[in-house]
């Protein structure tokens, strides 16, 4: 089994990559390491997994987990992502990468469309063209908007997002559903 994790320097991605690597699962992590969250924290997480970014390499093999490889990559870089999909045989893609932040999305909507919609489309296309059987992705509770029904339910209506961020995550849900129906 070989798993691709996007957003692997983020909080959830780091813990997931580490857990899979510890289990002996071939794990390939990518992350843009953008500055929305503290870059030094992301680098510290990678270092804790045995990834030394100071070596200035294209791919980094973990010194702690020989089955874990990391590459700095933005999902918006379609040629690089296409090359990655063509060079590896992934059984599962776990997409945790996203430009987060509700307030920031109101000031920088294009950043969210690029990362969360176009980037996710590149993931969907990679899975489709390379016949990857499983895609798991993280949505957000933001898709429920101003719903007063708490706790949220998966079958609750989520048709009225109140931020660009929430709209992009709802878009991801609809895109994934459509790709699943069209392409299996």
Regions found by a protein language model. Name each.
Residues 1-184:
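N-terminal Rossmann-like NAD(P)+-binding domain of SDR-like oxidoreductases, especially those catalyzing
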């Amino acid at each position: 089994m070989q798993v691709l994790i996007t957003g692997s320097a983020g909080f959830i991605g780091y813990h997931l990559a580490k857990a899979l690597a510890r289990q002996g699962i071939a794990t390939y992590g990518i992350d843009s390491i953008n500055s929305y969250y503290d870059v030094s924290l992301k680098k510290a997480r990678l270092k804790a997994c045995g990834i030394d970014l100071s070596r200035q390499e294209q791919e980094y093999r973990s010194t702690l987990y020989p089955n874990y490889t990391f590459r700095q990559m933005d999902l918006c870089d379609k040629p690089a992502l296409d090359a990655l999909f063509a060079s590896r045989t992934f059984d599962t893609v776990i997409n945790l990468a996203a430009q987060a932040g509700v307030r920031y999305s109101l000031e920088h909507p294009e950043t969210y469309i690029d990362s969360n919609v176009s980037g996710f489309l590149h993931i969907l296309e990679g899975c489709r063209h390379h016949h990857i059987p499983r895609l798991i992705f993280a949505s957000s509770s933001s898709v429920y908007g101003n719903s007063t029904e708490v706790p949220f339910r998966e079958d609750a209506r989520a048709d009225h997002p109140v931020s660009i961020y929430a709209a992009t995550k709802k878009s991801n849900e609809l895109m994934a559903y459509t790709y699943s129906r069209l392409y299996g």
